[in-house]
Design a protein with these regions (language model features):
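Membrane-proximal alpha-helical anchors
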Residues: 75-77, 84, 114-207
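N-terminal leader/targeting and pre-domain segments
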Residues: 164-167, 175-195, 199-202, 206-243, ...
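Short hydrophobic membrane-inserting helices
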Residues: 1-139
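Short amphipathic alpha-helical segments, especially helix-boundary/capping motifs
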Residues: 158, 263-266
Length: 722
């Protein structure tokens, strides 16, 4: 940033001379005085002609003309550009003498030009002398001010010149230090020389940022960014011994081979030489990381540091040493993509105002990103982790974790706008519990080789878990899905979806459950479980289906419990095979129910082991239906029939008018609550309304329990009547 050459003093004076006359005349105190003086002189000359007594005679006309000419000449002479623009002492004396002589002549001759009988001649002469003296005083003051202005201008010019020379010298010296520091940083022999170069460069960045002589802050940043780029480039540069990180991190060489004595000594000596060089380079690079890290932290938590305005590019780096960037604050984009971390990587409690790129990286040890805030996009896709902690983080735009591999991962308690975890592999446990997804959540096509926990999460828009494999069980208990949720085509060892709320559609079709599956106590708008296989027990007990429920074309190899549930719309069970015990007791089917052929299934259901249970003799629970127009046709060639009495399963009844009206009102209120939830999505009020829905569903469950419980007194009366 070199300074431009300034015009010298002579050029400046030459350029300004043509303006000085105007500047001189524009000074109101001087030009005004001259004009007033000339006006007074004009009045004095004209007064004798204008007076009533007509005091002037023809003999004095020449004298008056003389005095008038003298006054005009004096005025012109005082305003002569040569005199006005002159800085020399003789012209000031000329102005003073001209004024004095002119005033004296007027004081002497003007009274003569007036009749001798005129009174006040002495006063007139006295006034002229006073006016002349005042004019001389004004000229003196003007000259003094002019000299002061000239001196001040010269001093300012000198100061500016000295300041510019000093700044030019300082910046030149900085660039010399920068060049030398770069040479030191490239020294291959001594780590101490490289370390000196690091600290010099760090100090130069601080100096540029603190240089207030550079008015624009962005210009200071530009100078500092050049140095930051060099420091980042050094971190990115390859180091030959990095590939021996594991061996050189040990205190001594470990080898099972037996060598001859001299060979063993050579190997040991070479090991300690390499270890010393390795550790020296680690120290140099750690010093760079530490100096950057210290300046990325503000005085308070989550506040910017002195270097937070820079961009950092560590892409493609191999960190063969621990990396600590905790509590860092980045205002600009930061790039760590395609990097390899051989030691621990700690990025927790950091704030990223710009985009954060970590994709395509490999973490050989732990990676900690917990408690961080990403105000723009964050890309962690295609990475490999041993263990990774992203818990308690906030992603205000998009977050991409797709195609990654984790030994174990913790994403619990985080908040996402739009999140993509698709196509990832979790080799041990994965925890996503207690998280909030404000926009779409894409977790399809993932593989969970260990346990997975999604418990208590909220999905404010769509959530897609389709085509995933859970080899050791997964927990989705107590979650809320405010738009459609897709779990279709997945494979589960065991799965727990109990106590969840699905505001729109829930698709579990075409899935396989190798062991148990628990959907108990959930609330669905509409639900599709068709074409699924349950190799172990499955529990749908105590659920509420506000829309259609489709269980058609499924296979149940173990027990299937549908008891204690409420179906507001149609329920489809056709084309399914039930190989174990099936329980529908204590349920309410408000609309039609289909076990035979229908639009969803071309075949009827088949109960191969025993007939389904619609009446629980032990707990005295029956099933209530809202319509006679149901289809209980099942395949009796391969299984058991449904026992019927008057087109109704044995010991079951129709809803009475009072029960129907109650349910109609309940369903109407639940619909209103659902609409409120959709309207308040994303607000604090939303959680309260969700809790209201849970409480309302609890009341419905309690009412259903009472309504489906058969009172023993009534049974006894019926037996006596029969």
């Amino acid at each position: 940033m070199s300074d431009k050459k300034q015009p010298n003093a002579e050029q400046h004076e030459k350029q300004s001379k043509q303006h000085k006359v105007c500047l001189w005349i524009k000074r109101w105190w001087f030009s005004g005085t001259i004009l007033v003086g000339l006006a007074i002189a004009f009045l004095i000359i004209c007064l004798p002609y204008l007076s009533p007594e007509h005091r002037i005679t023809n003999d004095h006309t020449v004298l008056l003309w003389y005095l008038g000419s003298l006054a005009v000449t004096c005025g012109l002479f005082l305003c002569l550009p040569k005199i006005v623009t002159s800085n020399t002492k003789k012209y000031f004396i000329t102005r003073v003498l001209t004024t004095g002589i002119t005033g004296g002549v007027f004081a002497l001759l003007l009274p003569i030009a007036v009749k001798s009988t005129t009174t006040g001649v002495g006063g007139l002469r006295h006034s002229i002398l006073l006016a002349t003296g005042g004019l001389l005083a004004i000229l003196t003051l003007g000259e003094t001010r002019r000299k002061n202005d000239i001196d001040k201008h010269k001093n300012d010019q000198e100061k500016d010149k000295n300041d510019k020379d000093y700044r030019r010298q300082v910046r030149a010296e900085r660039r010399e230090r920068y060049t030398k520091a770069i040479e030191q940083l490239g020294d291959d022999e001594k780590a101490s020389v490289r370390m000196g170069g690091v600290y010099t460069l760090v100090g130069l960045v601080d100096e540029w940022l603190e240089d207030e002589s550079i008015e624009k802050y962005k210009d200071r940043l530009k100078e500092g960014q050049v140095i930051i780029n060099n420091l980042c480039a050094y971190i990115r540069s390859p180091f030959t011994l990095a590939s021996q990180h594991g061996k050189l991190s040990q205190n001594k060489i470990k080898s099972k081979n037996k060598f001859k004595k001299f060979i063993r000594k050579y190997i040991q000596r070479n090991f300690y030489i390499n270890k010393a060089n390795f550790q020296a380079e680690v120290d140099v690079r750690l010093s760079i990381i530490k100096e950057i890290h210290d300046r990325l932290k503000g005085p308070e938590e989550n506040t910017p540091g002195a270097w937070s305005d820079f961009e950092y590019d560590f892409s493609g780096s191999t960190f063969f040493y621990p990396v600590d960037f905790t509590n860092s604050y980045y205002k600009k984009p930061v790039n760590f993509r395609n990097s390899t971390y051989l030691g621990r990587a700690d990025f927790k409690d950091s704030t990223y105002e710009g985009r954060a790129y970590f994709r395509g990286s490999t973490y050989k040890a732990g990676a900690d990103f917990k408690g961080s805030i990403y105000q723009e996009g964050a890309n962690f896709s295609g990475s490999v982790y041993q263990w990774a902690n992203f818990s308690g983080s906030t992603y205000q735009e998009w977050a991409n974790f797709s195609g990654s591999t984790y030994q174990w991962a913790d994403f619990s308690g985080s908040v996402y706008q739009w999140a993509n975890f698709s196509g990832s592999t979790y080799q041990e446990w994965a925890d996503f519990s207690g998280s909030t997804y404000k926009a779409g959540a894409d977790l399809r096509g993932s593989t969970y080789q260990g346990r997975a926990n999604f418990r208590g999460s909220t999905y404010q828009e769509w959530a897609d878990f389709s085509g995933s494999t859970y080899q050791k069980g997964v927990n989705f208990r107590g979650s809320t899905y405010q738009e459609w949720a897709n779990f279709s085509g997945s494979v589960y060892q065991w799965a727990d979806f109990s106590g969840s709320i699905y505001q729109e559609g829930a698709n579990f079709s075409g899935s396989i459950y190798q062991e148990g599956a628990n959907f108990r106590g959930s609330v669905y708008q509409w639900a599709n479980f068709s074409g699924s296989t349950y190799q172990g027990r499955v529990n749908f007990r105590g659920s509420t289906y506000q829309g259609r429920a489709n269980f058609s074309g499924s296979t149940y190899q173990g027990r299937a419990n549908f008891s204690g549930s409420t179906y507001q719309r149609r329920a489809y069970f056709g084309g399914s095979t039930y190989q174990g015990q099936v329980n529908f007791s204590g349920s309410i089917f408000y609309s039609k129910t289909y076990f035979g052929k229908d639009g969803h299934s071309k075949t009827s259901s088949c109960f191969t082991n025993r007939s389904p249970q619609f009446y629980d003799e032990t707990n005295h629970k029956n099933t209530l239906f809202g319509s006679y127009n149901n289809d209980f046709t099942v395949d009796t060639n391969k299984g058991y029939p449904i026992g019927l009495n008057k087109d109704m399963p044995l010991d079951c009844e129709l809803l009475n008018p009072g029960q129907k009206n109650y349910l109609k009102g309940v369903f109407h209120e639940m619909k209103k609550i659902n609409n409120k939830i959709l309207e308040t999505k994303g607000s604090k009020e939303n959680a309260e309304i969700l809790e209201e829905l849970r409480n309302f569903n609890k009341e419905l469950h309690e009412w259903r329990e009472e309504a489906t419980t058969v009172k023993m007194e009534d049974v006894a009366v019926e037996d006596m009547e029969s």
